[in-house]
């Protein structure tokens, strides 16, 4: 009888352990939320639509990270399709983690050791160069004859850890410094909207600055470092924080409109490193918990979440009612913008950290194994590859595709031309 009781006890303990394990797994991996096209899904807010507000019409070919103010990473007017041939390439000498911007007939980019280049877009010849004295991990922004570039101290800058960080404003034609704004570590790619610059910092704040003078207009404190860039739509700034929340702020005053949360895991949350993209009345953003999220742009309500197999540092691109993002699990995903369902996924055989771009029905991305892929954005079929590129590879203008390699920027044009 004692043996029977002991056996029953062991079975009960095993069952309890299994139940606890299942509970722990579910707590660590909360179930995905499936969305609907009937809830806060505005089909008139298609990326690239001609109905977008006048403030969103761009004066330069590719003036900031993510292309437009909503950071959709989709450029509707550039008809460039592979295969490509190389026109020129420029060596930066060090890692180029973030892509350039294209404005005023130039390609502007920074290397990780703080060198900033202005290169003629047609010839690849260097027009000017400036040593910024700090390392960089962000794209510039360009407008009003000025190029804005953040720099940082701290990791991975080593011995420069105790030095301040700045946002530099430089004359786009000469490189002369017009002003600089001091803050905590700035890893966010700045957003230029209607004469204002929006940038986040490791000091937990989002800043709004006068783009002409650098004067601080307002700041908003989040719960942790702000490492991703901000997006703009309908008078609202959207930004993610390492505290596991997405914030919607009044672009004029900095007042909080709403705060949304990643799904909890054991009482904690993943962090938002990615820059949000705004389309269809929704805010799309990846998280280090391995999920891509969609929140209502007006309400902040969680509309859907979709789990990938690992971290999502990749900032999403949005086009054709699909959300495109890469994951550290080595897959590139096309998700239904309304529901979050997987429309297709592509095995890239390497972690994906950077962000995609959509041009003329082709989506481009790179893996950490330093290969760039071009896929049919509707089907996921591979159409072209390039043996360089590691993070966010592609920007463009009407004639050229500019591909960011590990230490080089390439200018490519379609082979058919």
Predicted ranges, named:
Residues 25-51:
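Ser/Thr/Pro/Gly-rich low-complexity linker/stalk segments immediately outside membranes or between
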Residues 1-14:
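N-terminal Sec-pathway targeting helices
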Residues 88-101, 129-144, 149-166, 177-193, ...:
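Extracytoplasmic beta-rich repeat domains
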Residues 14-24:
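Hydrophobic alpha-helical membrane-insertion segments, chiefly the h-region
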